[in-house]
């Protein structure tokens, strides 16, 4: 399984971020093709060291090829472009392949 991990940094207005993320961004991101699951952190995120992100989103796909195709799609491009509309604190995006142990 391949993952897209999004670490959203603390926004300037958390109320506006939360509202926009729930009402606008999630519906946009859920349209990304080949998306198998979409999970987000629930409540405050704690870091064992360093600064904790404000919100964590994990989008799962069957393969790295599926992530590449999804991000290249019009829906993936729309979701990426939408970040500038609400992620005032910035975001770190990581993609990786995972395996169960």
Q: Each predicted region: which residue ranges?
A:
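Macromolecular interaction modules
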Residues: 1-101
